[in-house]
Amino acid sequence: MKTLYSLRRFYPVETLFNGTLAXAGRDQETTGFAWWAGNARLINLSGKLLGAHVAHAGLIVFWAGAMNLFEVAHFVPEKPMYEQGLILLPHLATLGWGVGPGGEVIDTFPYFVSGVLHLISSAVLGFGGIYHALLGPETLEESFPFFGYVWKDRNKMTTILGIHLILLGIGAFLLVFKALYFGGVYDTWAPGGGDVRKITNLTLSPSVIFGYLLKSPFGGEGWIVSVDDLEDIIGGHVWLGSICILGGIWHILTKPFAWARRALVWSGEAYLSYSLAALSVFGFIACCFVWFNNTAYPSEFYGPTGPEASQAQAFTFLVRDQRLGANVGSAQGPTGLGKYLMRSPTGEVIFGGETMRFWDLRAPWLEPLRGPNGLDLSRLKKDIQPWQERRSAEYMTHAPLGSLNSVGGVATEINAVNYVSPRSWLATSHFVLGFFLFVGHLWHAGRARAAAAGFEKGIDRDFEPVLSMTPLN
């Protein structure tokens, strides 16, 4: 099974190093890769590669559990989550655990349970990883043919793809079931400032769900990132879960068509490059989602979005100056435009001043003050509620700006506070990781294509120029 073909033929890159460090079957002589090339040594050792992946999953889940408990231990219920540098508890709160009206945390026990469950799971995964890396069979093909594979076996590869798609679909439906049957999820748009509620009236209309995919990514359109009600989000997960599960069944039952067999490269490194490309796209989309979207990422937990903090500042000073007697409908600003209110290019009444660029912001504390033609002057004069004033003042002072040394706020502000928004961290980290994954995709795709074409660019190490040069010393 292991010697169907010469490994050197398929992995012609030489990595000269001390090959004696590795154990039998994983040394440079048999694999063509030195110890520091990591899992490349395990390309044809399915049992050992399984161990590496299970151990990696254990590390991931251990981080989730340990970081979860760390955040619980440091959590102060009196302060908003976004002031405490939390990135995991906001996700749990968004799922409706431990929070009540207005996003107030009423019970931290579910967060503790989540951390402990992840820690216990990581121990199981860690044991499985060590077992398969050190004790289990090197290859699975002989003893467990269902779990064995050859990278070139196109039918087996699409079967594995199908299994993965079904698991992803089940994951999407877990969110659907949580929202429908198990206590609901947090809805920032619930009247009076947000609350946990069960989603009863799902959006299943394909024109609505797939309409998001057809929207422009620019301006007030915002592609799928513009989704702003939970019915659409949960309905989208029903569609996505169904497509993943049906697609998974399809890939398990069918063999790749001739055009796919010809068009794609069928090797382990090619599959790695495809996966890295997909993860890169996920990273870039997640970056935009957490930066702009305050429905999937409620501002009560993640802090305001950039546009939201800016509009909140305009609103706060409109409230203040209106109380002091200013006529906010007609006051002129220094540029001759309205100081507090002006018209957008399409005629809606919007906030004036620098925040005009964010005129298409939608936020639950602001929408009740809009009429059919933008902000409603009579509502601004009579209907502003104390909770809207409090929330906008809070958001105004917590813009998602900040430097790496955690001095938050506008860089020129002398009263800057020690605050960096989780939105900043999550958006920048996902952008950077998405970029790294994209570079990894290019790298591995190039190597996979070169190997498939039967050539390999590199230095002929038997005749390196440096070998004939005078030693430096």
Curated annotation (Swiss-Prot):
Binds multiple chlorophylls and provides some of the ligands for the Ca-4Mn-5O cluster of the oxygen-evolving complex. It may also provide a ligand for a Cl- that is required for oxygen evolution. PSII binds additional chlorophylls, carotenoids and specific lipids. The modification Phosphothreonine is found at T15. Its main location: plastid. It is a multi-pass membrane protein. The chain crosses the membrane at residues 69-93, 134-155, 178-200, 255-275, 291-312, 447-471. One of its GO terms (molecular function) is chlorophyll binding. The modification N-acetylthreonine is found at T15. It is found in: Plastid, Chloroplast thylakoid membrane. GO terms for biological process: photosynthetic electron transport in photosystem II. It comes from the Eukaryota. Keywords: Acetylation, Chlorophyll, Chloroplast, Chromophore, Manganese, Membrane, Metal-binding, Phosphoprotein, Photosynthesis, Photosystem II, Plastid, Thylakoid, Transmembrane, Transmembrane helix. InterPro entries: PS_antenna-like, PS_II_antenna-like_sf, PSII_PsbC, PSII_PsbC_sf. The keyword Manganese applies. Residues 1-14 form a propeptide. GO terms for cellular component: chloroplast thylakoid membrane; photosystem II. [CaMn4O5] cluster binds at E367. NCBIfam families: psbC. One of the components of the core complex of photosystem II (PSII). It binds chlorophyll and helps catalyze the primary light-induced photochemical processes of PSII. PSII is a light-driven water:plastoquinone oxidoreductase, using light energy to abstract electrons from H(2)O, generating O(2) and a proton gradient subsequently used for ATP formation. PSII is composed of 1 copy each of membrane proteins PsbA, PsbB, PsbC, PsbD, PsbE, PsbF, PsbH, PsbI, PsbJ, PsbK, PsbL, PsbM, PsbT, PsbX, PsbY, PsbZ, Psb30/Ycf12, at least 3 peripheral proteins of the oxygen-evolving complex and a large number of cofactors. It forms dimeric complexes. This is Photosystem II CP43 reaction center protein. The lineage of its organism: Eukaryota, Viridiplantae, Streptophyta, Embryophyta, Tracheophyta.
